[in-house]
Amino acid sequence: MEINRSYPCNPGNYAVMDDKVNKYIVIHYVGATGSALQNAQYFERLPSIGASAHFFVGHASEGGTIYQSVDPKDRAWHCGAKVYRHPDCRNANSIGIEMCCHKDAQGNWYFDDETVEQTVQLVKQLMAEYNVPIDNVVRHYDVTGKLCPAPLVDEFAWLLFKQRLEVPAMGEKTGDNPSSWAVDHTEWAKAKGIIYGDGQGNYDWQGPVTREAMAAMLHNFAIAYGLEKED
Protein backbone atom coordinates (compact mmCIF):
# COMPACT_ATOMS: atom_id res chain seq x y z
CA MET A 1 0.00 0.00 0.00
CA GLU A 2 1.39 3.39 -1.01
CA ILE A 3 1.41 6.05 1.71
CA ASN A 4 2.49 9.63 1.03
CA ARG A 5 4.74 10.98 3.80
CA SER A 6 5.65 14.28 2.12
CA TYR A 7 3.77 16.52 4.56
CA PRO A 8 4.73 15.63 8.15
CA CYS A 9 2.71 17.23 10.89
CA ASN A 10 4.09 20.36 12.57
CA PRO A 11 5.89 19.28 15.79
CA GLY A 12 3.65 21.63 17.75
CA ASN A 13 0.60 19.49 16.98
CA TYR A 14 1.61 16.11 18.41
CA ALA A 15 3.81 14.51 21.06
CA VAL A 16 6.91 12.40 20.41
CA MET A 17 6.88 9.11 22.31
CA ASP A 18 9.55 6.49 22.95
CA ASP A 19 7.48 3.60 24.26
CA LYS A 20 4.03 3.87 22.68
CA VAL A 21 2.05 0.63 22.38
CA ASN A 22 -0.74 0.88 19.80
CA LYS A 23 -3.71 -1.07 21.13
CA TYR A 24 -6.49 0.68 19.21
CA ILE A 25 -7.28 2.17 15.81
CA VAL A 26 -9.74 5.07 15.88
CA ILE A 27 -11.76 6.06 12.81
CA HIS A 28 -12.74 9.71 12.26
CA TYR A 29 -14.18 11.88 9.52
CA VAL A 30 -12.67 15.23 8.65
CA GLY A 31 -16.00 17.02 9.12
CA ALA A 32 -15.29 19.37 6.19
CA THR A 33 -15.01 18.91 2.45
CA GLY A 34 -11.27 19.49 2.09
CA SER A 35 -9.02 16.93 0.47
CA ALA A 36 -6.50 14.73 2.23
CA LEU A 37 -3.71 16.77 0.68
CA GLN A 38 -5.21 20.01 1.99
CA ASN A 39 -5.56 18.53 5.47
CA ALA A 40 -2.02 17.17 5.51
CA GLN A 41 -0.64 20.53 4.36
CA TYR A 42 -2.75 22.40 6.93
CA PHE A 43 -1.39 20.40 9.86
CA GLU A 44 2.14 20.67 8.47
CA ARG A 45 1.96 24.43 8.07
CA LEU A 46 0.27 25.63 11.26
CA PRO A 47 1.65 25.07 14.77
CA SER A 48 -0.36 24.91 17.99
CA ILE A 49 -3.61 23.71 16.41
CA GLY A 50 -4.09 21.40 19.37
CA ALA A 51 -5.19 18.48 17.20
CA SER A 52 -3.72 16.00 14.74
CA ALA A 53 -4.16 12.57 13.19
CA HIS A 54 -1.78 9.90 12.02
CA PHE A 55 -3.38 9.43 8.60
CA PHE A 56 -5.71 11.22 6.18
CA VAL A 57 -7.51 9.18 3.50
CA GLY A 58 -8.47 11.11 0.39
CA HIS A 59 -11.50 11.54 -1.84
CA ALA A 60 -12.00 9.47 -4.99
CA SER A 61 -11.01 12.57 -6.98
CA GLU A 62 -7.49 12.29 -5.50
CA GLY A 63 -7.38 8.53 -5.95
CA GLY A 64 -8.06 7.81 -2.30
CA THR A 65 -4.46 8.80 -1.58
CA ILE A 66 -3.33 8.17 1.98
CA TYR A 67 -1.16 10.77 3.71
CA GLN A 68 0.73 9.99 6.88
CA SER A 69 0.86 13.11 9.01
CA VAL A 70 2.13 11.68 12.31
CA ASP A 71 4.21 8.53 12.71
CA PRO A 72 2.13 5.85 14.50
CA LYS A 73 4.89 5.52 17.12
CA ASP A 74 4.10 9.07 18.26
CA ARG A 75 0.99 10.42 19.96
CA ALA A 76 -1.42 12.34 17.73
CA TRP A 77 -4.10 14.39 19.44
CA HIS A 78 -7.19 12.91 17.82
CA CYS A 79 -9.49 11.47 20.51
CA GLY A 80 -8.75 13.33 23.71
CA ALA A 81 -11.60 14.51 25.95
CA LYS A 82 -12.43 15.56 29.50
CA VAL A 83 -14.95 12.73 29.80
CA TYR A 84 -14.61 9.36 28.06
CA ARG A 85 -17.08 6.66 27.09
CA HIS A 86 -14.35 4.13 26.43
CA PRO A 87 -12.56 2.69 29.47
CA ASP A 88 -9.13 2.37 27.88
CA CYS A 89 -8.69 3.88 24.40
CA ARG A 90 -6.71 7.14 24.54
CA ASN A 91 -4.38 9.20 22.36
CA ALA A 92 -1.41 7.51 24.01
CA ASN A 93 -2.34 4.00 22.86
CA SER A 94 -4.13 4.50 19.55
CA ILE A 95 -3.74 5.39 15.89
CA GLY A 96 -6.12 7.99 14.45
CA ILE A 97 -7.36 7.85 10.86
CA GLU A 98 -9.28 10.75 9.31
CA MET A 99 -11.51 10.01 6.31
CA CYS A 100 -12.24 12.80 3.84
CA CYS A 101 -15.94 13.32 3.16
CA HIS A 102 -18.65 15.18 1.27
CA LYS A 103 -21.94 16.78 2.27
CA ASP A 104 -25.11 16.33 0.20
CA ALA A 105 -27.90 18.87 -0.42
CA GLN A 106 -29.72 17.72 2.73
CA GLY A 107 -26.65 18.31 4.87
CA ASN A 108 -25.76 14.63 5.29
CA TRP A 109 -22.12 13.62 5.29
CA TYR A 110 -20.96 10.70 3.14
CA PHE A 111 -17.78 9.01 1.94
CA ASP A 112 -16.67 8.07 -1.56
CA ASP A 113 -16.47 4.31 -2.05
CA GLU A 114 -12.77 4.63 -2.82
CA THR A 115 -12.18 6.47 0.46
CA VAL A 116 -13.86 3.65 2.37
CA GLU A 117 -11.95 0.94 0.51
CA GLN A 118 -8.61 2.65 1.05
CA THR A 119 -9.42 3.10 4.73
CA VAL A 120 -10.33 -0.58 5.05
CA GLN A 121 -7.02 -1.63 3.48
CA LEU A 122 -5.06 0.81 5.66
CA VAL A 123 -6.76 -0.43 8.82
CA LYS A 124 -6.09 -4.05 7.89
CA GLN A 125 -2.44 -3.27 7.31
CA LEU A 126 -2.16 -1.50 10.67
CA MET A 127 -4.04 -4.30 12.44
CA ALA A 128 -1.48 -6.77 11.15
CA GLU A 129 1.52 -4.55 11.85
CA TYR A 130 0.55 -3.68 15.43
CA ASN A 131 -1.41 -6.82 16.30
CA VAL A 132 -4.63 -4.87 16.89
CA PRO A 133 -7.72 -7.13 17.16
CA ILE A 134 -10.84 -6.19 15.23
CA ASP A 135 -12.70 -5.41 18.47
CA ASN A 136 -10.16 -2.66 19.07
CA VAL A 137 -11.00 -0.87 15.83
CA VAL A 138 -13.35 1.80 17.12
CA ARG A 139 -14.98 5.08 16.18
CA HIS A 140 -14.24 8.44 17.76
CA TYR A 141 -17.88 8.14 18.82
CA ASP A 142 -17.07 5.02 20.84
CA VAL A 143 -14.24 6.78 22.66
CA THR A 144 -15.80 10.13 23.57
CA GLY A 145 -19.39 10.17 22.34
CA LYS A 146 -18.64 12.74 19.64
CA LEU A 147 -20.72 12.10 16.49
CA CYS A 148 -17.66 11.15 14.49
CA PRO A 149 -17.31 9.73 11.89
CA ALA A 150 -20.84 10.96 11.09
CA PRO A 151 -21.54 8.48 8.24
CA LEU A 152 -20.54 5.57 10.49
CA VAL A 153 -22.27 6.54 13.74
CA ASP A 154 -25.23 4.48 12.53
CA GLU A 155 -24.68 1.02 13.99
CA PHE A 156 -25.60 -0.86 10.80
CA ALA A 157 -23.22 1.25 8.71
CA TRP A 158 -20.49 0.59 11.25
CA LEU A 159 -21.22 -3.14 11.23
CA LEU A 160 -20.82 -3.24 7.44
CA PHE A 161 -17.51 -1.40 7.73
CA LYS A 162 -16.23 -3.80 10.39
CA GLN A 163 -17.27 -6.80 8.29
CA ARG A 164 -15.03 -5.57 5.49
CA LEU A 165 -12.08 -5.76 7.85
CA GLU A 166 -12.63 -9.51 8.11
CA VAL A 167 -12.35 -10.11 4.34
CA PRO A 168 -8.80 -11.14 3.33
CA ALA A 169 -6.85 -8.47 1.49
CA MET A 170 -6.01 -9.06 -2.16
CA GLY A 171 -3.07 -11.44 -2.34
CA GLU A 172 -3.67 -12.80 1.17
CA LYS A 173 -3.83 -16.58 1.46
CA THR A 174 -7.34 -17.88 2.13
CA GLY A 175 -8.72 -21.26 3.13
CA ASP A 176 -9.71 -23.56 0.29
CA ASN A 177 -12.32 -25.47 2.28
CA PRO A 178 -15.83 -23.98 2.01
CA SER A 179 -17.82 -23.32 5.17
CA SER A 180 -20.11 -26.17 6.21
CA TRP A 181 -23.24 -24.27 5.21
CA ALA A 182 -21.86 -23.71 1.69
CA VAL A 183 -20.68 -27.24 0.80
CA ASP A 184 -23.79 -28.18 -1.23
CA HIS A 185 -23.69 -24.87 -3.09
CA THR A 186 -20.00 -25.14 -3.95
CA GLU A 187 -20.34 -28.73 -5.17
CA TRP A 188 -23.28 -27.70 -7.36
CA ALA A 189 -21.33 -24.77 -8.84
CA LYS A 190 -18.37 -27.05 -9.62
CA ALA A 191 -20.58 -29.75 -11.16
CA LYS A 192 -22.35 -27.23 -13.39
CA GLY A 193 -19.08 -25.72 -14.60
CA ILE A 194 -19.95 -22.32 -13.17
CA ILE A 195 -16.83 -22.01 -11.03
CA TYR A 196 -13.44 -23.33 -12.09
CA GLY A 197 -10.41 -23.94 -9.91
CA ASP A 198 -6.78 -23.29 -10.73
CA GLY A 199 -6.29 -26.68 -12.38
CA GLN A 200 -4.69 -28.12 -9.26
CA GLY A 201 -7.86 -28.63 -7.25
CA ASN A 202 -7.78 -25.24 -5.52
CA TYR A 203 -10.89 -23.05 -5.61
CA ASP A 204 -10.09 -20.34 -3.02
CA TRP A 205 -13.66 -20.61 -1.74
CA GLN A 206 -13.23 -18.03 0.97
CA GLY A 207 -11.30 -15.53 -1.09
CA PRO A 208 -12.71 -12.13 -2.13
CA VAL A 209 -14.65 -11.91 -5.41
CA THR A 210 -13.57 -9.27 -7.92
CA ARG A 211 -15.91 -7.89 -10.57
CA GLU A 212 -14.03 -9.73 -13.30
CA ALA A 213 -14.40 -13.00 -11.38
CA MET A 214 -18.11 -12.31 -10.98
CA ALA A 215 -18.41 -11.63 -14.72
CA ALA A 216 -16.72 -14.96 -15.46
CA MET A 217 -19.08 -16.82 -13.11
CA LEU A 218 -22.15 -15.22 -14.67
CA HIS A 219 -20.88 -16.07 -18.15
CA ASN A 220 -20.27 -19.68 -17.12
CA PHE A 221 -23.76 -19.80 -15.60
CA ALA A 222 -25.30 -18.60 -18.87
CA ILE A 223 -23.39 -21.24 -20.84
CA ALA A 224 -24.26 -24.02 -18.37
CA TYR A 225 -27.98 -23.30 -18.71
CA GLY A 226 -28.02 -22.74 -22.46
CA LEU A 227 -28.60 -19.01 -22.19
CA GLU A 228 -25.55 -18.39 -24.33
CA LYS A 229 -23.47 -20.56 -26.62
CA GLU A 230 -19.88 -21.29 -25.71
CA ASP A 231 -17.37 -19.67 -28.06
Describe every region a protein language model picked out.
Residues 33, 43-46, 58, 72, ...:
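Structured segments of extracytoplasmic/periplasmic soluble domains
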Residues 92-94, 200:
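Short, solvent-exposed beta-strand edge segments and adjacent coil->beta transition regions
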Residues 20, 48, 90, 108-116, ...:
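Solvent-exposed, acidic/flexible segments
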Residues 1-8, 14-19, 25, 88, ...:
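Basic/polar, cationic surfaces and motifs that engage anionic cell-wall
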Residues 170-231:
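Short, solvent-exposed alpha-helical surface patches in non-cytosolic proteins
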Residues 30, 100-102, 200:
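Short strand-loop junctions, especially beta-strand C-caps/beta-turns
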Residues 1-90:
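N-terminal catalytic cores of peptidoglycan-degrading enzymes
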